[in-house]
Amino acid sequence: KTGYFLDASFRKTGRRLSYRASTYALSPDFETDVGFVRRTNLRRGSGNIGYEWRPESWLVNWGPSIDYSRNYNFDQILEDEQAQARLTFVFRGNTRLYLNSNREMERFRGIDFEKRRFGVGGRVASSRLYQVGGYYNSGDEVYFDNANPFLGYEESVRLYLNLNPVSRFQSRIDVNNTRFTDPNGRFIPGLNEGDVDENGQVFNVNIVRALSTYQF
């Protein structure tokens, strides 16, 4: 084995101001016999800075944060870039709300796709008996087709409910919907995999998951 893995980070967490910087690298020939490596040939750098105000009333704390990251391969080609601005509110009763705006670049089949996305979400966990939450994301997304990749529009919604009526029993329900459309008419029937309807919809997927466990 001749490959290598490098990971370095610095973090500072204060009462109001927090920041972090990190970098890691996975060489193209990195292998391991004791685990699975999702991706090699990667150099990544990222950073985060956030600030919090603490009214400590019905609004416990709130504040903005900024995240930025870049991924290069070992040929110095930029493959991914992401910048995110987020605003987070934490309320009494273990309730959280966030809004975020993303600017991203994703490289696929030698093409750089520039994306703009928006998201809003939150959760309520004011009781040990349950937790409910969800999010909504929308914006540009890549249609990953080897023959004709293009930039379309995606909306995704997720709602979940966790129930814990007794200490030994837990139940979780997830409802997910993802809808992808081609507003610019770039889908080519016969060349692209899949179909597109008269409204430009390429797919609309609904997934419902339920899992219950009881510990004896």
PLM feature segments, named:
Residues 2-216:
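Exposed, low-structure sequence patches enriched in small/polar residues
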